[in-house]
Amino acid sequence: MDGDSSSSSGGSGPAPGPGPEGEQRPEGEPLAPDGGSPDSTQTKAVPPEASPERSCSLHSCPLEDPSSSSGPPPTTSTLQPVGPSSPLAPAHFTYPRALQEYQGGSSLPGLGDRAALCSHGSSLSPSPAPSQRDGTWKPPAVQHHVVSVRQERAFQMPKSYSQLIAEWPVAVLMLCLAVIFLCTLAGLLGARLPDFSKPLLGFEPRDTDIGSKLVVWRALQALTGPRKLLFLSPDLELNSSSSHNTLRPAPRGSAQESAVRPRRMVEPLEDRRQENFFCGPPEKSYAKLVFMSTSSGSLWNLHAIHSMCRMEQDQIRSHTSFGALCQRTAANQCCPSWSLGNYLAVLSNRSSCLDTTQADAARTLALLRTCALYYHSGALVPSCLGPGQNKSPRCAQVPTKCSQSSAIYQLLHFLLDRDFLSPQTTDYQVPSLKYSLLFLPTPKGASLMDIYLDRLATPWGLADNYTSVTGMDLGLKQELLRHFLVQDTVYPLLALVAIFFGMALYLRSLFLTLMVLLGVLGSLLVAFFLYQVAFRMAYFPFVNLAALLLLSSVCANHTLIFFDLWRLSKSQLPSGGLAQRVGRTMHHFGYLLLVSGLTTSAAFYASYLSRLPAVRCLALFMGTAVLVHLALTLVWLPASAVLHERYLARGCARRARGRWEGSAPRRLLLALHRRLRGLRRAAAGTSRLLFQRLLPCGVIKFRYIWICWFAALAAGGAYIAGVSPRLRLPTLPPPGGQVFRPSHPFERFDAEYRQLFLFEQLPQGEGGHMPVVLVWGVLPVDTGDPLDPRSNSSLVRDPAFSASGPEAQRWLLALCHRARNQSFFDTLQEGWPTLCFVETLQRWMESPSCARLGPDLCCGHSDFPWAPQFFLHCLKMMALEQGPDGTQDLGLRFDAHGSLAALVLQFQTNFRNSPDYNQTQLFYNEVSHWLAAELGMAPPGLRRGWFTSRLELYSLQHSLSTEPAVVLGLALALAFATLLLGTWNVPLSLFSVAAVAGTVLLTVGLLVLLEWQLNTAEALFLSASVGLSVDFTVNYCISYHLCPHPDRLSRVAFSLRQTSCATAVGAAALFAAGVLMLPATVLLYRKLGIILMMVKCVSCGFASFFFQSLCCFFGPEKNCGQILWPCAHLPWDAGTGDPGGEKAGRPRPGSVGGMPGSCSEQYELQPLARRRSPSFDTSTATSKLSHRPSVLSEDLQLHDGPCCSRPPPAPASPRELLLDHQAVFSQCPALQTSSPYKQAGPSPKTRARQDSQGEEAEPLPASPEAPAHSPKAKAADPPDGFCSSASTLEGLSVSDETCLSTSEPSARVPDSVGVSPDDLDDTGQPVLERGQLNGKRDTLWLALRETVYDPSLPASHHSSLSWKGRGGPGDGSPVVLPNSQPDLPDVWLRRPSTHTSGYSS
């Protein structure tokens, strides 16, 4: 932040500055008047020895001659204007350093100097010199101390993003809240509110070939009938007068009564007793309960039979609402249930099931043994029951005692499991009845909800000592799902609490946690607005609510990383302003957030490739939410952090100090607070030990093991998921799919018990065979919205359809004959198939029934083919004769004008209706190939036919078996493309995608081992797994990419130390959130919790160990694999170009010679000596090819005493090799030592020499690094973090402390460079010279200081506490000694008295 003094017209009194502390100018310091523009006068910089004062075109501040050592320190200084050719930023004013700093005195100079800034109100230069933008270092023309001067104004427009956030955080937050509020209001008012009444909608494939045909077929069925678009009969008056009673199903029992009542006078007594006892036969539409023995024994014993009767009476019939729901007899009493005990009472002539005896059970078992053989052989069928005369010949072999009553057939067909008395167990002496079904005399549906919740929902009410209810089919699945979706909402809320509670513990701030939660909710609300209004999506499925947890998991990772970087910038810039911290933090975090957000959203958007509408809607909503969160986080998080830092952090600390003063209870609380603080410190120490030392050391040292282990896990997961046993496909169509946990009675009935009873195995009226429906006249085009399952399709007529021509008649007749010759044609189908309607027409025309409607031309006319009009006329007459009520389907569809609009021809195949995907696929492929061949020979009017069947389950299975692999592959490809665009590094992108792919493969393999079915919920979350597993890997990838070190091991350690702690905390919080969702009843919540647990934990492992181990082996070094662009300057690029080039920082050919009045010397830097600690062998990871200390070792000690006892030489010249502090703190942000063991060139000129005393190296030529903007300039103009590959974080190092000799404390190297006018070339730029240490390196004393202007201090302290007073032994800021060797990095030194850990270690 700028804390500058304001200008005043008079110089008598100090003017208050706009700084945060209200700095004032010291008394007695004169203010010079404005002298004019900077371009009015140009002066040459004169060395301090030549002139005691420097003139300025703006000011003239006399500087006292520093040669008089006895006088007081100078109180005035001369402001020096910055010319347009100066490499310094022109937006800053400079003042020269005291002259005595150029002398080699024995004491530290400048300790008592006070420099006053001359106020100034003129305009600034427009732009900096271009030489400062090329990423190279050039010494400045004049020695300057950089400060920022800001005019005093009531309002000043922010010049940068960081300044906007730092100075106006409340305004930024309010603006974001206003945008969120407006978008929420527009989203709620501009579209329909979401309707979750049918939460299972959207899980049927749509917009596929099979799905479109099914949708059109359902629409054709819905639009066919009386008073509809199409008619089965061409008579208009008949269709218009037909009432809805024609389509209304007959009342229960009416069909049976109409067929039975005329025969009741001759029926036996047993049959009349059964009809009087039960209210007809059991039906599928009744509610059902499944009983099993508690002791795993047989249910065919008297105790179990009586137990079932009592449980029904106590739990169901005693409920108050049962009487209003049950079917009633003629006596207005509730009908008895169809249970094993009641059938036993009927066959034994008992009044109730509780009156039956053991003898009755034994007698009935013997009768069942006899009749079971005929039932399983197919002889005992409903048509054989009763004493009627019109029975099929095969009924004659059935004994009368088995067929005279329907009780035996109903017991075997409806109530007893298929294994009881099956052909394999008929000879058992004591057959075992494992399961028995009970039919309640109430229809299935929502009316049973109260009975279920009051009596059947609790498990302890469904069991006694003999039997228990383990399965139910009450028709309540949809209704109960809506109930539990609301009731189980507590589990996702607990998961959210776990995520944000872990975040609060990590951030140690409730305010920040609430702001993050508010940011997540705001992102979702804005995404809802875009989803509803911008994208105009009509359907908002219930699964979109899962985006709250998914986005919270992504946000948790970003938040932890951000505040780690925020704390790090605070520790590295303790005196820097908030604008500096925001700029430095967002330089790294903005890059990471951009790459992570784009990669995650691209992975979610890839799921749009799915054909399930619910999955596509979630992909669109979740991808949009991630992008909105990306945009919002760029301003929301830093503004929240600034707000907390400015108004809450310091105020809370002050209130906390004053709150503990008081009585004994408060002292007790203080003791507790101290204990908790001690625990927190212990946890922090453990965290530093684990993530700063052990984890990097373990990853690098055992990288061989990690690569092999995780590669084997990924390969095993791929084998399990793709080869054996694989993910099982669903066995039920979407409406009956699994929605509750597997142990729920509803799910157990559908998954286990439904197939155990023979009446459920075969669909009614169709014999269990797959039908084939051939359609002509309607195109298979789904005109509905593929993203809205509620939208219905309309029928698209085929304009070329014609079935009345002679060629069409011949082809249709031949199609019937050829179909009968196919192997899949069922020859035992009942009645004539409508496929052969031409044969049916021929037989009708030759039959006597043709004349029922009166004399007609059709009767007796056998000339084939007929004329088109005659053919259509006879078809209409046949339809009227055989279906006078308009309900019999002959395969003909007429429109309102009586014309033939469509043909719907059906026949039955010998393929069984099975949930087996392979068998259904064989049926579909065989029929498709046959029909394609037939249509190829069809006349033009019949070539656009198509077929469908009972393929709802197959359509879902086909989509789930093919789409997840495609979606995951596309998601990985998009992730790779996004990472490549973000890093421009091919190896890093490949390694990241490999880690993400390994995460997905291992996760799917684990889900297979958990016996997951690849159902709709699983497909939903598998499509999101790539998006969930990206962020941890991106954390490490970006941190590795932004690391300033060129060697891969240092970069691996750097990235692990920087992000591993936040990554582990985020994974632990999400694991806890997943565990809290496991008790939920709704399967969606449970599986979302499992996915969160598995994906995040597996992703953390693959990112931390597999990805980093790959980088240890094959990670890019320097520019390896980097797609270079003109604006991308890597931190290790300086000085590595062509040696003969005119690159900044390289010595020019004529600059070595001395200039007039100067005695230039050359210095050369040697690698700094390092000393191993005793724990080196156990605490570092070393290379087998060298004995250099590991980059992970922090045990190398920094010495305050002399490293060498060689006497120090006196400086040869006042102008020594100096360092510009801008180059120090911008080019290489991390602490690093120059290593003689690693050189970039293919033929290094120097080699390390090792002996038993330590490590030495040959001298290396040095070259200064390129300068950049100073920290002050960064606050006003943030660096472009997307063009620069170097991180702005300073002090993040994996190397160890180094030391130079401290034998000569007076031989210091100044911070900035002063250049005489003779050293300037023709263009006014300084001429660079190569420096040499002349073999005196061991006696060089490095006392470099950081040049920072602290606006938080009063102006009177600036001269003593700015660049002079700061940077002492206690200052933790690092210093840099540039290396003249272009292939080697600079020498970075840590302050002597600090030994930091964590990121700065």
From Swiss-Prot:
Q: Which residues form the SSD domain?
A: 471-643
GO CC annotation: membrane; plasma membrane
Q: Annotated region Disordered: where?
A: 1-91, 113-138, 241-264, 1169-1192, 1229-1337, 1352-1401
* Matching PROSITE patterns: SSD
Look up the domain of life of the source. Eukaryota
Q: Which residues are glycosylated?
A: N239, N349, N465
Q: Which ranges are annotated Polar residues under compositional bias?
A: 1175-1184, 1284-1305
Keyword vocabulary terms for this entry: Glycoprotein, Membrane, Methylation, Transmembrane, Transmembrane helix
Can you say where in the cell this protein is located? Membrane
The record, for InterPro entries, names:
Dispatched_Hh_regulator (IPR052081), SSD (IPR000731)
Compositionally biased region (Low complexity): 1259-1270, 1352-1362
Give the residue spans that cross the bilayer. Answer: 170-190, 484-504, 510-530, 542-562, 589-609, 617-637, 704-724, 964-984, 990-1010, 1019-1039, 1064-1084, 1088-1108
**Residues where Omega-N-methylarginine is found:** R1366
Set out the biological process GO terms recorded for this chain's protein. smoothened signaling pathway
How does this protein lie in the membrane? Multi-pass membrane protein
What family does the entry list?
Answer: Belongs to the dispatched family.
Stated name of the protein: Protein dispatched homolog 2
| Organism of this sequence | Homo sapiens (Human)
Give the gene symbol: DISP2
